[in-house]
Amino acid sequence: MRLGLDPVLQDAIRLGTTVLATAGDDLSSERMQAGRVYVNYPASSPYVLGCGGTRIALDGARGSIVNETVWNDDGVHSTGGGISEEYQVPAFQAAARIPGSLNDGRRGRGVPDVAAAAAPTNGYRIFLNGVDFVASGTSAVAPLWGAFIALINARRGQSLGFVNDRLYQLPNLLRPIVTGDNKDTTGLGYNAAPRLERLHRGLGSPDGGAIVTALTTIA
C-alpha cells in the first residue's frame, strides 16, 4: 500500500493539495499484543500531516482550557503515535529531537505532526441525517485540522499545499503537550516530553485563531 499510495501523495503536493490523516485510536501498540510499537499509515508518510489526539480539561465557568494531556483511556483506547521504521526523519523534522523507536532504537519519521482534543469526553457535536450525536477520536481531529486549512486557503485565495514544513517553523502557534502517554495496559508506549520531542501529539494542539492568521499571511 505504501509504495502505491506515496506517489499519489506526492502528486497531491505538486497540485497544491494538503493531505491529512489520523494517527489512530489504538495506542502505540495498535492493540496487537505483539510486544512491539507501530505507527499508522498514511499518517506516517512524510507527505501527509499526521493528526493525533489529546484530552482537555475546561474551566467550568469560562469554558477555557486549563489543562491538556495526551489522550489515553486507561491503556485501552488512546492516540496512536511513535516512530516510523519505514521512513527516515524528514527535513521538516530535522530540528526536532526525535527519539529512537522503542523497537530497535532507530530514529525515523515522528508521528503525528499535530493534535487536538480527541477524548470521548471532549467530543464534537455532529448533526447528520437528522441525528444529533458526539464524535471523537483522531478521526475527528483530522477533519478539524482540515477545516483550519480550508479556512486559511479561502482567506489566502490560494492553497497552502504541503503545510508540514511551515508548521514546524511556527511551533509557538501550538500548545505543547508535555504530560501523558499512549501506553497500553502492559506499559508499552511513549511518554509525552517537552517541546521538540514530539511523539503522539506532534507539535501540539492548535491555537486556531493564531494559526489561521499566521498561515493566511505567510508566503
Predicted regions and their residues:
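Extracellular protease catalytic domains of secreted zymogens
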Residues: M1-A219
